[in-house]
UniProtKB/Swiss-Prot annotation:
It holds the Pfam family V-set. Residues 21-118 form the Ig-like domain. Immunoglobulins are composed of two identical heavy chains and two identical light chains; disulfide-linked. Residues 1-20 form the signal peptide. Residues 79-116 are annotated as: Framework-3. It comes from Homo sapiens. This is Immunoglobulin heavy variable 3-64. InterPro entries: Ig-like_dom, Ig-like_dom_sf, Ig-like_fold, Ig_V-set, IgHV. V region of the variable domain of immunoglobulin heavy chains that participates in the antigen recognition. Immunoglobulins, also known as antibodies, are membrane-bound or secreted glycoproteins produced by B lymphocytes. In the recognition phase of humoral immunity, the membrane-bound immunoglobulins serve as receptors which, upon binding of a specific antigen, trigger the clonal expansion and differentiation of B lymphocytes into immunoglobulins-secreting plasma cells.
């Protein structure tokens, strides 16, 4: 299995009331029927996006964080949790500093808040 360093940076990181320079802003919220599909995007700024592996995690209502997927800095290597393998596809566009998660064959248990992380 690949080794991905993960420093939990979600959305706009706030530390001791001071806004950090690193920003990860997700988009792609939607109401989807079971079996449907949805693409999430994460626009990154404040760091050299192409130098970092990137990650998706999620949190279902009333539950803890669940690791979903990761992609290496150049996009050549990917990892998926067993729960999403074969249904979700992670990708990135380093020229746009953007991370994506294409989600397909959606199930009720996929309902969650999704976060991108560096």
């Amino acid at each position: 299995m690949m080794e991905f360093g993960l420093s939990w940076v979600f959305l706009v990181a706030i530390f001791k009331g001071v806004q950090c320079e690193v920003q990860l802003v997700e988009s792609g919220e939607g109401l989807v029927q079971p079996g449907g599909s949805l693409r999430l995007s994460c626009a990154a700024s404040g760091f050299t996006f192409s130098s970092y592996a990137m990650h998706w995690v999620r949190q279902a209502p009333g539950k803890g964080l669940e690791y979903v997927s990761a992609i290496s800095s150049n996009g050549g290597s990917t990892y998926y949790a067993d729960s999403v393998k074969g249904r979700f596809t992670i990708s990135r566009d380093n020229s746009k500093n953007t991370l994506y998660l294409q989600m397909g064959s959606l199930r009720a248990e996929d309902m969650a808040v999704y976060y991108c992380a560096r």
